[in-house]
C-alpha cells in the first residue's frame, strides 16, 4: 500500500504536465497519448533505480541543484506554452517534440531520483516498486493527457495559457519547497 501511495504522489507533477500537454496538443490521438504517457511513466520508474544505485555518490550534489533545474525547465516550458498560445489562437494543433517531452519527463521525475536513494535503506524490492511507480504514472498521465486534450478542444488558447501557468507554478512550488520557504 505504501508504494502505491508513493507512486500516486510521485505522479502528480506528471499528471499536471500531461494535462498541459494534452491541452497544447489537442490533435493527439490514442497512439501519441500513449507515447507521452509511456515516456513519463518510464522516467518516473527509471529515476528511482538510478537514485538507488548512484544516489549515495551524488546525493549531496543532486540535492543542491535539483530544485533549480526543475524550476528552470518547467518555467521555460510554461513560458513557451503561453507564447505558443498567442501563435495558435485559432486552433491548437501543436506537436510535442521529443526534446520537450524528455525535458518535462526529467524535470518531473527528479524527486523520484531522490526517492530511489531512500529505497536503499529499506527492504522494498526496487524492481517491483519501480514497476508499480511506472505503471501508476503511465495510467494517471494517460488519463490526464486525455482530459487536457478535451479541455484544449473546448477552451483553445485559454487552455494553453492555463497549462503554461500550471507548469510555472509547479516549478515555483518545487523551488520554494526545496529552499524551505514553503
UniProtKB/Swiss-Prot annotation:
Major place of residence: membrane
Keyword entries, A-Z: Cell inner membrane, Cell membrane, Ion transport, Manganese, Membrane, Transmembrane, Transmembrane helix, Transport
Pfam family, one: Mntp
Record InterPro entries: Mntp/YtaF, Put_MntP
GO MF term list: manganese ion transmembrane transporter activity
Record-level GO cellular component terms: plasma membrane
Subcellular location: Cell inner membrane
Keyword Manganese tagged: yes
Topology in the lipid bilayer: Multi-pass membrane protein
TM helices/strands, residue ranges: 3-23, 42-62, 65-85, 126-146, 161-181
Function: Probably functions as a manganese efflux pump.
Family the entry assigns: Belongs to the MntP (TC 9.B.29) family.
Protein name in UniProt: Putative manganese efflux pump MntP
Organism in which the protein naturally occurs: Campylobacter hominis (strain ATCC BAA-381 / DSM 21671 / CCUG 45161 / LMG 19568 / NCTC 13146 / CH001A)
Gene: mntP
Amino acid at each position: 500500500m505504501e508504494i502505491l501511495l508513493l507512486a500516486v504522489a510521485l505522479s502528480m507533477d506528471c499528471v499536471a504536465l500531461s494535462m498541459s500537454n494534452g491541452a497544447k496538443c489537442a490533435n493527439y490521438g490514442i497512439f501519441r497519448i500513449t507515447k507521452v504517457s509511456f515516456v513519463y511513466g518510464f522516467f518516473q520508474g527509471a529515476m528511482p533505480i538510478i537514485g538507488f544505485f548512484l544516489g549515495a555518490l551524488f546525493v549531496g550534489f543532486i540535492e543542491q541543484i535539483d530544485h533549480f533545474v526543475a524550476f528552470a525547465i518547467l518555467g521555460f516550458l510554461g513560458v513557451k506554452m503561453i507564447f505558443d498560445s498567442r501563435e495558435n489562437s485559432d486552433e491548437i494543433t501543436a506537436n510535442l517534440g521529443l526534446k520537450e517531452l524528455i525535458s518535462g519527463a526529467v524535470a518531473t521525475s527528479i524527486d523520484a531520483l531522490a526517492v530511489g536513494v531512500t529505497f536503499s535503506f529499506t527492504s522494498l524490492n526496487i524492481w517491483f516498486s519501480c514497476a508499480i511507480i511506472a505503471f501508476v504514472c503511465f495510467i494517471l498521465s494517460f488519463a490526464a493527457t486525455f482530459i487536457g486534450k478535451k479541455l484544449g478542444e473546448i477552451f483553445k488558447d485559454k487552455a494553453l495559457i492555463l497549462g503554461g501557468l500550471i507548469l510555472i507554478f509547479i516549478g515555483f512550488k518545487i523551488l520554494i519547497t526545496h529552499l524551505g520557504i514553503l
